[in-house]
């Protein structure tokens, strides 16, 4: 089988004789578009890349329809880092800093005392939230610990960020023993050792088929068709207008007076600006009032 160049793709694969499943993802435009409208410190860029990869892999391995949020909160220079994703592999990310961060800052230096919160919101079913202490050197290690604690499934992650052909790129591998399988720790350890041999230039530059052959050429690997990833913010003029209506009308009128009759709202995630004068706001209000009367 052959595939076109695998930028912004996620692949699932299965080791037929090992009862272990895997995933591979590479984020090119998905990652760079996340960074385009922000001037994040280098260490924050790398962390967001790692979180994007982790969110992509988690969304695929959990196999649900809905959204997932991976969020870091701490009392260090990096106040917040959050990634949202869904089953369509549409991803977005945002970070907020409150002090300078060195380019080579470690996770603990950026976060201070913090937690990693994973929120899973299926379209049908109950919402789930897991809180993980950021007590290990990397996001990867914290997530591996999360799977052991919450899913009782041995899981291994390889997550890398860097540059390839002059552009930011992030990529990763996930290995996991199949639930209710006969997979052995020895099988998993063997595949994990092979995964750790992957070089950055292989992870960022090779097509999936070639990469997996280099790593696992002695294994029987079934590779499934890829899924595309993309940066997708999801903001809209309608959402911004409805957000304004959360304020009392007196406060909205004051804002209009202060801003020469036009309120501008900029999406913190993608940078898109939306402008609203009094007429536009009243149109949103009339529509909201109609929906309220209908009980919607």
Curated annotation (Swiss-Prot):
SUPFAM superfamilies in the record: Hsp33 domain, HSP33 redox switch-like
Keywords: Chaperone, Cytoplasm, Disulfide bond, Redox-active center, Stress response, Zinc
Stored Pfam families: HSP33 (PF01430)
UniProt keyword annotation of Zinc present: yes
Compartments, record wording: Cytoplasm
GO cellular component: cytoplasm
Superkingdom, taxonomy of origin: Bacteria
Record PTM text: Under oxidizing conditions two disulfide bonds are formed involving the reactive cysteines. Under reducing conditions zinc is bound to the reactive cysteines and the protein is inactive.
Residues making up the signal peptide according to the UniProt record: none
Disulfide bonds: 233-235, 267-270
Primary location recorded for the protein, binned into one broad class: cytoplasm
Any one GO biological process: protein refolding
Any one GO MF annotation of this record: unfolded protein binding
Family: Belongs to the HSP33 family.
Role summary: Redox regulated molecular chaperone. Protects both thermally unfolding and oxidatively damaged proteins from irreversible aggregation. Plays an important role in the bacterial defense system toward oxidative stress.
Family matches, as HAMAP family: HslO
Protein name as catalogued: 33 kDa chaperonin
Organism: Actinobacillus pleuropneumoniae serotype 3 (strain JL03)
